[in-house]
Amino acid sequence: MSERNDRKVYVGKVVSDKMDKTITVLVETYKTHKLYGKRVKYSKKYKTHDENNSAKLGDIVKIQETRPLSASKRFRLVEIVEESVII
């Protein structure tokens, strides 16, 4: 029961919403270089389940780790933190 609370939660930007019920989320974070100690920015893309197709390109979203939903989907959409502004 405690492992359900240990699931990873990330905040990232939607970079693709072309698939049905699936979005691609880019999560940026920092790592410290082992030798020099400088913080280096790196990013990773996660395929995420979006049941209602509610997230759009450019939105900032919160995603949570879940059971495998397909060959590549391991996360689900929790909430849309900030909607993108289309000019």
UniProtKB/Swiss-Prot annotation:
GO terms for biological process: translation. GO terms for cellular component: cytosolic small ribosomal subunit. It holds the Pfam family Ribosomal_S17. Keywords: Ribonucleoprotein, Ribosomal protein, RNA-binding, rRNA-binding. InterPro entries: NA-bd_OB-fold, Ribosomal_uS17, Ribosomal_uS17_bact/chlr, Ribosomal_uS17_CS. It comes from the Bacteria. PROSITE patterns: RIBOSOMAL_S17. The keyword Calcium does not apply. GO terms for molecular function: rRNA binding; structural constituent of ribosome. Belongs to the universal ribosomal protein uS17 family. HAMAP family: Ribosomal_uS17_B. Part of the 30S ribosomal subunit. One of the primary rRNA binding proteins, it binds specifically to the 5'-end of 16S ribosomal RNA. This is Small ribosomal subunit protein uS17.
